[in-house]
Structure formats: structure tokens, C-alpha cells
Swiss-Prot record:
The lineage of its organism: Bacteria, Bacillati, Cyanobacteriota, Cyanophyceae, Synechococcales. Part of the 50S ribosomal subunit. Transmembrane segments: none annotated. SUPFAM superfamilies: Ribosomal protein L16p/L10e. Residues 149-160 have a biased composition (Basic and acidic residues). The gene is rplP. GO terms for cellular component: ribonucleoprotein complex; ribosome. This is Large ribosomal subunit protein uL16. InterPro entries: Ribosomal_uL16, Ribosomal_uL16_bact-type, Ribosomal_uL16_CS, Ribosomal_uL16_dom, Ribosomal_uL16_sf.
Length: 160
């Protein structure tokens, strides 16, 4: 499972999850991706379970990139412990996920959109956040359509 090799401090505050992801919100490596729709903590176990589900489905077909890393320690106190006597020990690691963050990417010559969609669907079931499937091809098509509209408008302005 994923966890940092070493950290500056053993324990962290829980923090708040406000706003949307400003980094890691575009497809960088593959053609298909799984994007978070709401905020939450994704544990190292959930990331590993999702990775296994996708890998089993695509077999040796393509490549999977994990775009999140669990770098936040979550501490817990033992059961039936009295109040006080300090903060508990780190029990597991989580990745803080905000809306718009890309969680996984998939690509390769053998990977079709149907295969990628089904593999990502299997991974979605393992995650505690709402997600959606996105494709880099569609993003390119949308931007190219917007560019052609802008070009037509500018040509009409030049004619007048």
C-alpha cells in the first residue's frame, strides 16, 4: 500500500476541504480518466483496491496512472480510552481529494473507450467520493469546436 517513506512530522491536523482542485485537474498521461465530483478522503487501501479492480479488468492491455498519493496521516485513539493523554498514533494514510481532481488515468493502444469505461466503473465502486469518467478526446473536440466558432465570428467581423 502507498504511504510516505518519511515525513517531517508524524501527526497532522484534520484540516478542511474547501473549494475545487486547482492542480491535478487535467488529463496528463493517458486518454481516459476518473475525475472526482465531490470532496473527501481516499485511503491507501481504497486506492489499492481500485487499482487492483482496474488492473484485473484490463489484464495486460494498457497502462494505469495513479494521480493521487496518500500523504496525510490519520490518528486514532484505542477503544475505551479515557479523555486526555495526548493525540493518538497514526493508523492509516489518506489522500485529500477535492472536486475536479483526476484520481486515475488509463491509456494504451489496446484500450478502447468501452474497456476503459468498464474498468473505471469497477474502480468507482471502491471509492468513497462521487466520480465521473472523462476522455481527453472529447475535451479536444469541445475545445476545437469553440475555436471554430470563435474563428467564424472573427471572420464575420472582418467582412463587416
Amino acid at each position: 500500500m502507498l504511504s510516505p517513506k518519511r515525513t517531517k512530522f508524524r501527526k497532522q491536523h484534520r484540516g478542511r476541504m474547501r473549494g475545487v482542485a486547482s492542480k491535478g485537474n487535467t488529463i496528463a498521461f493517458g486518454q481516459f480518466a476518473l475525475q472526482a465530483q465531490d470532496c473527501g478522503w481516499v485511503t491507501a487501501r481504497q486506492i489499492e483496491a481500485s487499482r487492483r479492480a482496474m488492473t484485473r479488468y484490463i489484464k495486460r492491455g494498457g497502462q494505469i496512472w495513479i494521480r493521487i498519493f496518500p500523504d496525510k496521516p490519520v490518528t486514532m485513539r484505542p477503544a475505551e480510552t479515557r479523555m486526555g493523554s495526548g493525540k493518538g498514533n497514526p493508523e492509516f494514510w489518506v489522500a485529500v481529494v477535492k472536486p475536479g481532481r483526476i484520481l486515475f488515468e488509463m491509456g494504451g493502444d489496446d484500450i478502447t473507450e468501452e474497456i476503459a469505461k468498464e474498468a473505471m466503473r469497477l474502480a468507482q465502486y471502491k471509492l468513497p467520493v462521487k466520480t465521473k469518467f472523462i476522455s481527453s478526446d472529447k475535451n479536444l473536440e469541445v475545445s476545437s469546436q469553440e475555436n471554430t466558432k470563435n474563428n467564424k465570428e472573427s471572420q464575420e467581423e472582418v467582412k463587416q
